[in-house]
Swiss-Prot record:
This is Fluoride-specific ion channel FluC. Its main location: membrane. Fluoride-specific ion channel. Important for reducing fluoride concentration in the cell, thus reducing its toxicity. Signal peptide: none annotated. The chain crosses the membrane at residues 4-24, 35-55, 70-90, 95-115. Na(+) is not transported, but it plays an essential structural role and its presence is essential for fluoride channel function. One of its GO terms (cellular component) is plasma membrane. It catalyses: fluoride(in) = fluoride(out).
Amino acid sequence: MNNILFVALGGSIGAVFRYLISIFMVQLFGSAFPFGTLLVNIIGSFLMGVIYALGQVSEVSPEIKALVGVGLLGALTTFSTFSNETLLLIQSGAWLKAFLNIALNLCLCIFMVYLGQQLVFSRI
């Protein structure tokens, strides 16, 4: 039961961060490209790499994994919004933006997981 509370706490924090980041990015760049979703996915991927690597080199408590890995990062990142925004770009005929959104999300997020892991592993 404790882990459920940690997931809920982390999820509420992650959801608020996602909302604030998305609003900030729309104010900064407009809404022609989903920069907010891209940024939260990049941040979340980096942090997931850090959490994973920390778990490989030391003991990460189940509560921290629930709070950060499942709750915070689960609510911060969003595959469903990425998918919907990409489909909307395709439906509006913005094929290049849709392809760019797919490529950036996949490539940058995988790279950020790697970068997060390497940051931890290089400090050992």
